[in-house]
Every structure is written in C-alpha cells, then in structure tokens.
C-alpha cells in the first residue's frame, strides 16, 4: 500500500509511506517537512516504521528526518553519494532557502541494492543521476510502482540547474533507466501527481 502525504515546508513536497497491509510495517520515503503531521499519521494508522529512505539529498526531501529518526528510532538510508548534499547546506539548498540543515549518520545504498520491508515487500534501487548525482528511484516490479524523487514529474522532468545537476545525465537516466520499466509502472514523484511510464513516453512522443 502507498500512502501519499503532501507536506508543506519552503516548497510543497510529496512524502510517501510504503506499507504492508498485513503487518502495518512500513517505510517512509522523502519526509520533507511537517514531522508532527507524519507522526500523527503513523500513530493514527497503527504503523511501525522500519526505515526512512531518501531519493536524493535536497533539504525539501529530508526536512523532517531528524525529528522522525529521534521519535521512531529507525535508520535513514540514502545513496552512497548523498553526503555531497546531506552534509553541505549549499549543495542541499537549505542555506539559500531556510537556513543551514544537514543530515549525518545515514546508511548508504547503491545501484541494484534491494531494500526489504518483509518477504512480500521490497524496493530495488535504480540509480538515476541528473537532477543530482545521488538521485535514485525505488522500484517494486511486482506492484509496478516507483518512487522517483525529482527525476521526472507528470509531463515534465527534474530541474538540472541546481548544484551538481546535469541535463545530459538526467535525460540519459530517464531514457535508459526509467523509460525501460513497464509502461504500467506508476511513478510517484516529489512534486506532482502520480503518472505512469507509458503516459510519460506518450507525452514525449515515444
């Protein structure tokens, strides 16, 4: 089950809960702001959060991490290149927007790793640099879902002008890593309503 929660910090951003219906255990993906609201959802739905996952290291995707980590006592996972952003307020854009924010002590994953919730629920890491050098999507083949961060949105692509961004890499990631997923894969992004691989390919004339 996927729960979508819009959170409002400096930017509005979508945080996601990936939850087992049977056990109520779950993962939080990109908790950008409003930690108290997210904690209320966890309590009201009887959820047990095992891990916090980041699709990339911009502050609007990790703004609620520290409070959640303290309250939930769970690890925070990010790509092996994420410290370029998580430890640098200029790179993660917090200094320019809200004041310095950093995240330390994250567990690192890499392309191809599987992040397991239980035997029936897991997410595979697919490396998609371009928006940032640490950007990933988190994919479940059986359920045909992917949490794509800011790599792609409905009928648009991620920003590549921020520090570390690269237009050519972003387009390559979309074409070679994202658009090769099944057309019915639902894409959950950081700043737009869900779309599908097939819908985006059609939008771009493919």
Indicate where each model-derived feature is located.
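Conserved beta-strand hairpin/beta-sheet module of binuclear metal-dependent hydrolase folds
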Residues: 1-45, 137-149
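Short Gly/Pro-enriched turn/cap motifs at secondary-structure boundaries
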Residues: 6-8, 104-107, 127-129
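Active-site neighborhood of phospho(di)ester-bond hydrolases with catalytic His/Asp-centered motifs
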Residues: 28-29, 50-57, 76-80, 127-130, ...
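Metallo-beta-lactamase
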Residues: 122-206
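Active-site HxH/HxHxD metal-binding segment of metal-dependent hydrolases
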Residues: 34-121, 203-206
């Amino acid at each position: 089950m996927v729960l979508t929660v819009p959170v409002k910090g400096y930017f509005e951003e979508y945080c996601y809960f990936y939850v087992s219906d049977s056990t109520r255990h779950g993962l939080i993906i990109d908790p950008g702001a409003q930690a108290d609201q997210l904690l209320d959802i966890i309590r009201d739905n009887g959820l047990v959060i095992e891990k916090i996952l980041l699709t990339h290291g911009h502050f609007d995707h990790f703004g609620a991490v520290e409070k959640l980590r303290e309250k939930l006592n769970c690890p925070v996972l990010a790509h092996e290149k994420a410290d370029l952003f998580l430890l640098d307020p200029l790179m993660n854009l917090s200094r320019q927007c809200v004041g310095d924010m950093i995240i330390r002590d994250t567990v690192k994953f890499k392309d191809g790793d599987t992040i397991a919730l239980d035997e029936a629920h897991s997410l595979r890491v697919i490396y998609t640099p371009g928006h940032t050098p640490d950007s990933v999507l988190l994919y479940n083949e059986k359920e045909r879902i992917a949490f794509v961060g800011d790599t792609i949105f409905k009928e648009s692509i991620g920003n590549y002008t921020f520090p570390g961004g690269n237009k050519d890499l972003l387009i390559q990631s979309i074409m070679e890593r994202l658009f090769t997923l099944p057309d019915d894969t639902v894409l959950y992004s950081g700043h737009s309503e869900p779309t599908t691989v097939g819908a985006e390919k059609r939008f771009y004339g493919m």
